[in-house]
Amino acid sequence: MVHLTGEEKAAVTGLWGKVNVEEVGGEALGRLLVVYPWTQRFFDSFGDLSNAGAVMGNAKVKAHGKKVLNSFGEGLKNLDNLKGTFAKLSELHCDKLHVDPENFRLLGNVLVVVLARHFGKDFTPPVQAAFQKLAQGVATALAHKYH
């Protein structure tokens, strides 16, 4: 569960309604793979990830980024039950994929950077703080199976 004030919920949901999930998702996952290259080991089947241009232009990265952001959006609809919302994904990433749960936090931080880039002055410090809190809540929910 993530505790957002009424103002924070309004800020997050208001901005989320303007997010191009395909564009932002692809960029966020792409940046994760470029900035933290060790995360690429989970995406061997994605083809060429040899440099930033290849990663950012990779159709599979973009498609998976969209999928990731759609899941994040589901979390927004279920703020009071993030652990339940992400239980199956947590189990998959822990038991089958063996993803380091720290990667969830890194992706959340990258998502905040990408949102700031896309929304500029509308991504005020209070909006950033609310998204950072939400990203941490989602990362914690995804890491739940690991505990």
From Swiss-Prot:
The modification N6-succinyllysine is found at K18, K60. The modification Phosphoserine is found at S45. GO terms for biological process: hydrogen peroxide catabolic process. One of its GO terms (molecular function) is oxygen binding. Heme b binds at H64, H93. InterPro entries: Globin, Globin-like_sf, Globin/Proto, Hemoglobin_b, Hemoglobin_oxygen_transport. The keyword Phosphoprotein applies. Hb1 is a heterotetramer of two alpha chains and two beta-1 chains. Belongs to the globin family. This is Hemoglobin subunit beta-1. It comes from Chalinolobus morio. The lineage of its organism: Eukaryota, Metazoa, Chordata, Craniata, Vertebrata.
